[in-house]
Structure formats: structure tokens, C-alpha cells
Amino acid sequence: MLQKALILVFAVAGIAGCVGCSTTSHYVYATLPAANELAVYREDPFSGTLTELAGTPYTIGDGAHSVVIHPSGKFLYVANPGQNENDISLFDILSNGYLNEIPPRTTVAPNGTQPALLAMDPAGNYLYVMNTGSDNISVFSIDSTGGLTQVPNSPFFIGLTPLNMVLTPSGDFLYVSVAGGQIGTSNGSILGFSVSSGALQLLNPPLTSADGVNPNGLVIDPSGSYMYVANTQSDSISIFAISPPNTPPGTLQQVIGSPLDDIYSDPFALLLDPKGQFLYVANQGSSNVAVYSIDSTTGLPTALTTSTSAFAFTTEGSPSFLVEDPNGNYLFVGNQGSSAGIQAFGVNSGNLNPLLTYAVGNTPSSIAVAP
């Protein structure tokens, strides 16, 4: 089964007149797996408005499911998990946002199947591919042309059904959330790896209980001190300190007060603002995005509230992914279900201002924004 990809929520600050906004346009890329397409939009830096580029969407690989952009802004990668593909597409990003595919596509076969999720280290040296059909992770080094070469001993075995993965900001550790019911407990777990030249080595101990069922959402704060886990079926958020004092590097230790009961239902995707001050939670069951402030000392989230209720912003459908634009000025929510599309918000100190919703023809599975 292909896993739902986390798409994106764009955090937005300074909406009124967009004070302090960059005047540079960014380009937004959305995968549409049912149509095997990649949609491309220009983001207006002052309003957050998205305008689809003429001649797009592009027809690309079978089941195109996850997209990631190189930190240089030069290259874009798409995972194609369909039975006719099992590969990664590479594109040059042109100055006007258009794409030029660079053949041939890079296969994850024969030892990898259904490459459903991509992640890249902050330096842009390695691409990590989560293969949900073979329960492993393929790792590729990236050369100066964007080309991919599989590192020695790749793919790296997980052995459990993976749901999501996240790298620390340093790129030294990678964590994979896995479904429960496989190791004698209904709770999901977090599998930890140290990273050296792209190669993965299991931490000791390798598994940490997520203390919740179906840990779909993962996010790490900008300092690399805390990891937040959305436990969809348990309606909770678990918080872990990363490498706390007197523990081996990479150790996860649940903080006091975790897990935190989510005030809404079915939390699926998480996003932290660039400063790590606010946590955004996409709740599929209640079709909204809740906002929490983060205690910088303990890492614990606290729901923001009005005089009568908690902050929650209604989405047009079932929100499945969140991503911010590079300037932290806009937040975009990927909605699935009968109202599939991309919903834009402006952000100001955690407050979300609904802007526009964009119908994309097919359900989006992921989004990336060029820096």
C-alpha cells in the first residue's frame, strides 16, 4: 500500500501589506499521482496567490507521489512508485520555474519497490527514499549535476511497515515511524539510525515506542532538540528530546507531559514554523489545522486559544500535508477527499489567515517550494 505523503503547509508571517516579504517569486510543485502529473505554480510574494504556469501540469512517472527540491534550487526529484516505474525522476529547474527532465530515471529495483517518500539532507549531498513495498530505505549520493548514485550497502532494511521519516537538521540522524501491531504492541514505534556518508546504522536500542497508534506525522525543531509525533489513531502528539544529557547520541527520550492529547481528531501531519515557536497540526478527522505554541525550555506544546475556544482553522477537505514557503510567509495545506486541492493561509504569530483554495483536478500527494 502506498502511504499518504505529507504535503505541505506554508507558514506565513506579516500578512498586512506583507511587510518584510521578499520580492522574489517562488515556484510551487505539486504531485498528482492519480493522473501521473506534476503541477507547477508561481507564488506571488506579496499575496501568496498561486498562478499555474502555462503548459503545465507535466505528465511524469507512474504514480508520481513525493517531490523534493535540492537546497540549491537547481534540481527537483520525484518518486514514481507505480508498478511500471519504481524509480526517481530528476529535473533541472529553469529560472522561470519550468522543468527539464534529465534521463534516464534512477531505479530503486530490484531490492526496492514502491518508492513513496523522499527526504534530503540539509546540505543536499544525499537523497533518502522510503520504499513502502519492500520496507527499506534506498540512499543515493548527489553529484554536481544532480545525478544519483546508490551508496554502498543500500537499501537499508527496516523490516517493519514504514509510515514516515525525518532527518535532524544536522543530517546526523534519521528517524522512521513504523506501524504498530508488529512487535507485540498496538502502539507504533520510532526506528532510529545514525548517518555517516549517507549510510545508515541502527541506533542502540533501535526502537522507541511512539506511545500512540499510527505515528504518521513527524517533525523536528530547527535546533534538533525535540521531535514531535502525530499519533493519528490515538488522537495524541508525542514529544521526544533528542540526545538528552547523559544518553548516547541520537537517543529519543519522551519528555514529561507527553503524549499530549490532541484537542481535535486524527492528527496526521505536523509543521513547525522556522523559529520553532509554533506547531501546526493537520487534523484529518475534524478537517482543520490547530495551532500550538512551543515552550522553548521543555519543548511542550500549548494550544493557542481565543477567549472561548482553541485556535483551529477550517480546511476545505481532509488535510494530509503541510509545508511552508522559504521565507516563512505563507502556509499551504494539501487537502484530500471530495474537496481535494491546495489551500493557502497567511501566518502572523501563529494566527492563520485564510487566503485562497486551488482546485488541482486530482488529489495532491505532496508539494515542494523552490528556494
Name each region found by the language model.
Residues M1-V19:
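Sec-dependent bacterial lipoprotein signal peptides
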Residues C18-P371:
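Predominantly soluble domains enriched in secretory-pathway, periplasmic, or organellar proteins
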